[in-house]
Amino acid sequence: MKNFLDKIFFKSNNLDNISNNIKELTSKTSVNKIFDVVNSYSSESEIRYVGGCIRKILNNEEVDDIDLATNLEPKQVCEALQKENINFYESGIDHGTITATIDKYKFEITTLREDISTDGRHAKVKLSKNWKEDASRRDFTINSIYSDREGNLFDPYNGKEDLKNGLVNFIGDVDKRIKEDYLRVLRYIRFFLNYSKHPHRLEVIRKLKINIKGVSRLSKERLLDELRKIIKINSLEKLAKDKICLELILMIFSEFKNFNIFLKLNSTQKDILKKIDFIFL
């Protein structure tokens, strides 16, 4: 959903004043229709913003993607959308996700879930009605924040405070979280470079290094997609200054050993190479 709504910006620097920002997001997007159809499905149906879009609103970043969580089951979501003639597709239904399309934009609507088992790449899940259970399966506290369209937060792991204080904390046991999905090694790097105001915790780094071999089990597509996000958000210059993050990257992508050459290029040359995906080959 690139350039979503010409990249909405939120001007306030006050993390306690997000209600208006979320209301603005709701009013300026087609997502309001989805809230309406889900909330009207039954007296007990609920739907909330979740994850990256809330994190970005809190941090005054541009919102380029909207994810939603609901206590409705996928088939019920389909029924609700169908009733109002909202287009959708079910390619992610095995994982509890229905993708609605309105005005050419996509909105992922995912049923609350609980992990049953995982092989380090994909989790087997069962559907849930429990918001805290759903939050507990997420990777970091800053990604486990939910909000209704009025801006009322559900934040069981104090992700808002962690974001405000520049803390990147795993939810629960670090080793378990990483083993559930080895991509979280790279996600830690991305979020640490972007949000942390503190040194790395040695115990976290130890767990990341212990589990880093598991990253090789992931698909090339998932790895490169996450690497692109790291570069896009943080730039190689920022990565170069963090020796621990750089060490982890080099353990995964040995091709990066000569990336200092890239740092010596001027901005125009860097932009050209990024456009042709040179640095991801």
Q: Predicted segment positions?
A:
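Catalytic cores of the polymerase beta-like nucleotidyltransferase superfamily
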Residues: M1-L281
